[in-house]
């Protein structure tokens, strides 16, 4: 059949060529899938503009956008890194409980709603970031605020209440300045 003998190289190859100086240097996130999933909506809330720029660059350079979009990708990484660092500073206990629950439950969000509600409350109060599902119809209860989960292994305790951030006009990703008691 073939005239040459197949040769398999089992060594890992590293490309040691440095990136050009025009590409900004950035440290990687250093987080596994569970912490990233736990913080994903908050990363999306704060880093939306960077994500949109990156996706626009990828769409404008189909099939060859890897090198052209490195700058935008580095901005996304830097922003996500800042969100993870801020959550670790402000809400470490709640964050750790939530991502550990995700890790223990095969990354199934519905198994960890009570821990998620506590994390959402802490992040909103300390960082002003809200968990919002994009394109959610206004007349439908978001899945993360439902008190009854169909596929959950155990029922949500009656004492657990979902955190619903106060509604406000304008920018939905900022914490309210001061709660005024008008009623």
UniProtKB/Swiss-Prot annotation:
Any single Gene Ontology cellular-component annotation: mitochondrial inner membrane
Annotated motif Cx9C motif 1, positions: 47-57
Cofactor comment text: Binds 1 iron-sulfur cluster.
Main localization category: mitochondrion
Family: Belongs to the complex I NDUFA8 subunit family.
Protein name, per record: NADH-ubiquinone oxidoreductase 20.8 kDa subunit
Motif Cx9C motif 2: where in chain: 69-79
Chain location of the short sequence motif Cx9C motif 4 per the record: 112-122
GO biological process, one term: mitochondrial electron transport, NADH to ubiquinone
Pfam families in UniProt: CHCH
């Amino acid at each position: 059949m073939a005239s040459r003998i197949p040769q398999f190289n089992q060594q890992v190859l590293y490309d040691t060529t440095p990136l050009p100086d025009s590409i900004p240097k950035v440290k990687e996130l250093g987080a596994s899938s569970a912490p990233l999933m736990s913080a994903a909506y908050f990363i999306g809330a704060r880093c939306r503009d960077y994500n949109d720029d990156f996706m626009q660059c990828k769409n404008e350079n189909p099939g060859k956008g890897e090198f052209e979009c490195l700058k935008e990708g580095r901005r996304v990484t830097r922003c996500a890194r800042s969100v993870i660092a801020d959550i670790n500073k402000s809400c470490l206990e709640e964050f750790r409980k939530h991502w550990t629950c995700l890790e223990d439950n095969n990354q199934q969000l519905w198994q960890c709603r009570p821990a998620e509600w506590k994390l959402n409350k802490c992040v909103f109060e300390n960082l002003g970031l809200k968990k919002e599902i994009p394109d959610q119809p206004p007349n439908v209860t978001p899945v993360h605020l439902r008190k009854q989960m169909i596929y959950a292994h155990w029922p949500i305790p009656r004492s657990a209440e979902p955190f619903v951030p106060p509604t406000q006009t304008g920018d939905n990703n900022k914490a309210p300045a001061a709660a005024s008691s008008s009623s």
